[in-house]
Amino acid sequence: MMLRELNDTQIEDLLKNQLIGRIGCHSDGITYVVPVNYIYDGLNIYCHSGKGMKINLMRKNPEVCFEVDEIKEITNWQSVIAWGQFEEITAIDEKQQVMQKLINRIMPHIVDDSVPPSHGFVDEEGDTVELIIYKIVITRKTGRFEKR
């Protein structure tokens, strides 16, 4: 077994082809890693969220990392880590475009078609919670793999 580096094409392919990645953020002595749906356009990673710990931490410290992987078995996997800056998207038209791209990317993978993708979250009282749309502007990325 030997770890090897992914080349640029392999890194791009993994980022473009996966649906779920993990964002790592840190502020005020708290490190938080959470899975997210995302899209990647070759430059930036786009995600959505409701308010909460992840958004609070990224607003305080916009330096984040993003991890995505494909694990076929314990000795056959690949992983990419990207570092970058959290930027909240506030322009309505850009938010709508990103959300539509996210929906288009995710819809083919939804097994239960009775549950449509939402354009917002609903809290415990049934009230709609505003979606926060953001991007990670990638500054660096690297990838590794193992294949026996």
What are these model-predicted stretches?
Residues 1-17:
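Extreme N-terminal tail/first-helix region
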Residues 12, 37, 56, 72, ...:
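Short secondary-structure boundary/capping segments
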Residues 18-50, 66-67:
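Short beta-strand segments
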Residues 27, 70, 137-140:
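Short, structured patches in soluble enzyme cores that scaffold and shape functional sites
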Residues 49-52, 62-69, 115-121:
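Short acidic (Asp/Glu) patches
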Residues 54-61, 65-83, 87:
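Helix-adjacent hinge/juxtasegments
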Residues 78-148:
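Charged, gly/pro-rich active-site loop segments
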